[in-house]
Amino acid sequence: MSQMTKFEEDYQRLVLQWANDRNIIDGSDNIKQLLKTLTEAGEFIDAVVSEDVDEFVDAIGDQWVTLVIGMEQSGVTYQKALDSAMCIDTSDDSLKNDTVILYAISCIADGILKDDKALLAQGYGIYLHVLRNLKTSFTFGVAAAWNTIKDRKGKMVNGVFVKESDLKDGQ
């Protein structure tokens, strides 16, 4: 059984406070958060394909932030997600990280649609394990994501947080 690290606990607390301060937890829902996760997963896969190390590390942290917020919205604790994940050895070359991430996303989506917390926890847990298995890139990615968002301002638009730099005139 995998335990939540002090590093994860500290950054989870920071991210959840940041998300609460911006009304992302209550002003949105886990479906919209899953869409953000899908966007970040696409950026992760693009970084892998293009062998862009900086973007790869950035995408790891961004995915983690969306998962932490999604778990909070879904009522799934971080440790419950870690405990619920099926054992998938992502170091095995026959199971590529992107394939496992897509499976995890499908579990999360199915869990949302069925309002099934066990399935949600399993999907979040599998996804977390993939990111954690990336070792050093995981800690750098999470820290970099936090440093990017910690002072970010924006507003909720149709249940989605839009950063200030992306807001169009009149929004």
Predicted feature locations:
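Flexible "arm" and connector segments at domain edges
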Residues: 1-171
